[in-house]
Amino acid sequence: MRKVGLRIDVDTWRGTQQGVPHLLEILSLHGIQATFFVSVGPDNMGRHLWRLVKPQFLWKILRSKAASLYGWDILLAGTAWPGRQIGAGNADIISAAADHHEVGLHAWDHFAWQTWAGVWDNAHLEKHIRLGLDSLSQIIEQPVTCSAVAGWRADQRVVKAKESFGFRYNSDCRGTTPFRPVLADGSTGTVQIPVTLPTWDEVIGEGVSRENYNRFILDRIKQDTGTPVYTIHAEVEGIVMRKHFSELLEMAAQEGITFCPLSELLPDDLSTLPLGKVVRGAIPGREGWLGCQQLIDH
């Protein structure tokens, strides 16, 4: 059996309200547990519309048919009106997810983090983490043990900012295998579990269609030479593409692929993990910079 970490990002009000319940039902049907990373503050995702002036982002919107995929309520959220508080308005749903799955912090304000985290100082980074952490721990009535920044917008500054919160692990970057990030003083920080596989919106329309996506991603899992981690989004696989996602899980089981929460990918002895850093980089299909794993050779 090939073990794959299944990460579910929840970015918006609609993704929480509609997508998460669908995904909980699908996962229960297939007997699978996953890790949900949830956004709990204001839903301002519609403010990303200004990025349409950037050719790469515009092409992504066009090839993924974003309006039909996400819905106009997501694409316009927080533009003409204040963004709704996701956690406060959907606490029962988030709590239900935590009853059966690992739940970690994604963001307080997903839009703000994705847009400004690259220039915020440490105090501002810590403020947003604290806001999200306090809200989420109150909702699920237990400590939050893991986190994953919005849009993989992370570097060594973000790694440092998270150190005081005592997470068991973070999943802030793209890469190949879990590692221990080296801090500026030479010590090692909280373990990172990178995402290794592409997401739906990164590849659809780039030679990959809705019809052959499941086959594409299963083949990529089999080709993965590291520790495979796959990310889906409640706004996509939990709503419009939920039938496709259920079919993916069925196909995976038939082909000897099993999914698990990210924490189950960690070894008992974390000191056996390689050392590395989170550096800014780029990947095909995603506009702008994002955190990438850089392993340190001994």
Swiss-Prot record:
One term of GO molecular function: hydrolase activity, acting on carbon-nitrogen (but not peptide) bonds, in linear amides
Alphabetized SUPFAM superfamilies for the sequence: Glycoside hydrolase/deacetylase
Keyword Acetylation: no
Record field: catalytic activity: 4-deoxy-4-formamido-alpha-L-arabinopyranosyl di-trans,octa-cis-undecaprenyl phosphate + H2O = 4-amino-4-deoxy-alpha-L-arabinopyranosyl di-trans,octa-cis-undecaprenyl phosphate + formate
One of the record's GO cellular component terms: membrane
NCBIfam families for this protein: PRK15394.1
Signal peptide: none
Pathway assigned to this chain's UniProt record: Glycolipid biosynthesis; 4-amino-4-deoxy-alpha-L-arabinose undecaprenyl phosphate biosynthesis; 4-amino-4-deoxy-alpha-L-arabinose undecaprenyl phosphate from UDP-4-deoxy-4-formamido-beta-L-arabinose and undecaprenyl phosphate: step 2/2; Bacterial outer membrane biogenesis; lipopolysaccharide biosynthesis
First-level EC class: hydrolase
Family the UniProt entry places it in: Belongs to the polysaccharide deacetylase family. ArnD deformylase subfamily.
Pfam families, alphabetized: Polysacc_deac_1 (PF01522)
E.C. designation(s): 3.5.1.n3
Naturally occurring in which organism (per UniProt): Enterobacter sp. (strain 638)
Protein encoded by which gene: arnD
Protein name, UniProt field: Probable 4-deoxy-4-formamido-L-arabinose-phosphoundecaprenol deformylase ArnD
GO biological process, one term: 4-amino-4-deoxy-alpha-L-arabinopyranosyl undecaprenyl phosphate biosynthetic process
Keywords tagged on the record: Antibiotic resistance, Hydrolase, Lipid A biosynthesis, Lipid biosynthesis, Lipid metabolism, Lipopolysaccharide biosynthesis
